[in-house]
Amino acid sequence: MLLVLPRLQQKWLNSRECPTLRREAAKGLFPTKDDPSACTRMSPSDKDILILCCKLGIALLCLGLLGEVAVRARRALTLDSFNNSSVQDYNLNNSENSTFLLGQGPQPTSSYKPHRLCPSEIEIRMLAKNYIFTNKTNPIGRLLIMMLRNESLSFSTIFTQIQRLEMGIENRKRRSTSVEEQVQGLRASGLEVKRGKRSTLVKIGDRWWQPGTYRGPYIYRPTDAPLPYTGRYDLNFDRWVTVNGYKVLYRSLPFRERLARARPPWCVLTQEEKDDIKQQVHDYIYLGTGMNVWGKIFHYTKEGAVARQLEHISADTFGMSYNG
């Protein structure tokens, strides 16, 4: 009878203990007089491997063709939808509000190209809208207006021009302009500008900002801000403090900032505050009482005075010692 063991046990058994397969169980494993090619039949021949490779190749080819057909069908559908849609011109002139179709450029032969396809009319109009309405004198905006009016320009020409212009603008940004030039440039845009030490300052609301540093309205003024050392807890139970008028979560402060805000620096405390902290530490160590910060404030309220009187009375009544 064949002894069937789990695979791991079979693997780690000694050869002496491993039962030899006999009779029916050993059929096809070892060459015998009746069946000399038994062991070679178990491994695939070169012919089998070749057939398998051919099948895999054909399957991959079919997948690729299917993908190509799907991409072409999708492209045809999108082009039809663009041609059927009546896209209104972005009022470049008040008198001019025409609908026209830009001729699609030559389509690439295969969808597996590393570069982007030619941009659609919608994309170009969105680009034009963004560039024209941010700044009328923008060279890219002017180029796009010209392009929208002149349909004969090819897409490749237009977009190489746009890239060149953008690179030129980037290079101009990198060159440091003098503060005077910055002031003149910003004054032209109708903002209230003044000259700072290192750069221009723009007035937004009632504060002066360096260009690029404005992050929305100035929320927390010094009167409204939480105490700089203790901070407050928001609705998510996150501790926060204000930094330059903005709410900053305590955990997102750099380590040194957090360390500095743990308590006021010792040198800025008055002698009374220093003695109070020392007394609190002494009580905490020797008397085992909790360091009650609000206790001192509570003592000076009416409720606090009543509570202290009650504590004194109860201590006298029940013979308990009171450490005030």
Curated annotation (Swiss-Prot):
Q: Which InterPro entries match?
A: MMTV_SAg (IPR001213)
Q: Which residues lie on this side of the membrane: Extracellular?
A: 70-324
Q: Where are the transmembrane segments?
A: 49-69
Q: Which residues are glycosylated?
A: 83-84, 93, 97, 135, 150
Q: Give a short account of what the protein does.
A: Superantigen.
Q: Does the keyword Transmembrane apply?
A: yes
Q: Which family does it belong to?
A: Belongs to the mouse mammary tumor virus PR73 superantigen family.
User: What's in the misc comment field?
Assistant: This protein is coded in the long terminal repeat (LTR).
What are the disulphide bonds in this sequence?
A: none
Listed GO cellular component terms?
membrane
User: Keyword set for this entry?
Assistant: Glycoprotein, Membrane, Signal-anchor, Superantigen, Transmembrane, Transmembrane helix
> What is the official name of this protein in its record?
Protein PR73 5'-endogenous
